Amino acid sequence: GLKDWWNKHKDKIIDVVKEMGKAGLQAA
């Protein structure tokens, strides 16, 4: 289910979100 998918991918997703957040802050 979704929870298994999230647990498998969450570390990568969190890294991507952090990178997008940094890029957004720099662009602002």
Curated annotation (Swiss-Prot):
The synthetic peptide has antimicrobial activity against the Gram-positive bacteria B.amyloliquefacies S499 (MIC=0.05 mM), L.monocytogenes 2231 and S.aureus ATCC 29213, against the Gram-negative bacteria P.putida BTP1, P.aeruginosa PaO1 and E.coli ATCC 10536, and against the fungi S.cerevisiae, R.mucilaginosa and C.cucumerinum. It is not active against the fungi F.oxysporum and B.cinerea. This is M-poneritoxin-Da4b. GO terms for cellular component: extracellular region. Expressed by the venom gland. One of its GO terms (biological process) is killing of cells of another organism. It comes from Dinoponera australis. Its main location: secreted. The modification Alanine amide is found at A28. It is found in: Secreted. Keywords: Amidation, Antibiotic, Antimicrobial, Fungicide, Secreted. The keyword Chloroplast does not apply. The keyword Transit peptide does not apply.
